[in-house]
Amino acid sequence: MTAAVELEALPFELRPELEAHEPPEARGAARDDVRLMVSRTGVAELSEHRFAELPQLLLPGDLLVVNNSATIPAAVTCTTPQPGIGSVTVHFSTAMPAGDWLVELRSGSGQATAPLRGGTGGRRLELPGDVVLTLTERFSQRLWHARLSTAVIPYLLRHGRPIRYSYVPRPWPIEAYQTVFATWPGSAEMPSAARPFTPRIVTALVSRGVSIAPVTLHTGVSSLEGGEDPYPESYDVPAATARMVNLTRQTGGRVIAAGTTVVRALESAAAAAGRAAGGLAAASAGWTSHVVTRQTGVAVVDGLLTGLHEPRSTHLWMLGAFADDDLLRRCYQVARSHGYRWHEFGDVHLLLP
């Protein structure tokens, strides 16, 4: 897929009152105290639940595949204001195969930042800790290849803060942006579909006979913008997970992906190994620019647990691989009219075959 492809978006307005401004814990609730909408292919009626009911909605023999990437505090504000701009914040997005990083420059600091389209190759930005970030070449209208004068992840763990957008009015510690499965640091933004999982939900799933297997995909900043080419993300599908996926499918179980990142990892690995046509998962690791859409289809994933996505988000492309337009339109109409909450601290949607 290239930038020439138009967004197949669901036309709707996301009203501010539908944005989740804080995690459930802020109101004294548990992480798993969010709402869960369930849709099924070929079934007109939707069902609405609490997330704690998830174990009863999956079947013994199903496999839940989760992303064990941990969120890094990927935002850092430059120490020296830029002429004509003022404060500049750097969002570290993606580690690249050559050792550099894709970064997004944003004007402002803290919550009130906006994309900054300027910049020139060779520009040096001074960061806290006497560290220098050098822009090397432009990747897209908003992203730059850049190199840091020290190792990136250890630096961010010491000096960075979680990326936060305007709909979240106050800062939260990095722990609020980690899932229960987080193991390997690398995601600029939380693989948020798995945020509602808690140890009690995991225990209930296993007791139900649902297996759980990990993949790793380090996700970058936000959804692609219109006209923007996909950027590569690092992924790893272990051999044990690929075997579990194939065994589940062979024995009649369903493979459920906890998040769009899991779908991308599994489908990228199958395609890289030339096994997608046979519906077989494969062990693979590397970088992927694969975008899953209705046109590409899905080869090894049967269902998807995901958050609610913004209008014109490219994540909606992927939902088209699991449901037709009428079903998706109905889901999003119900979500808006019933007061579901969007974004990383919000409610979730389970798409089943």
Task: Label every model-predicted segment.
Residues 1-353:
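A cross-family signal for N-terminal binding/gating loops and helix N-caps
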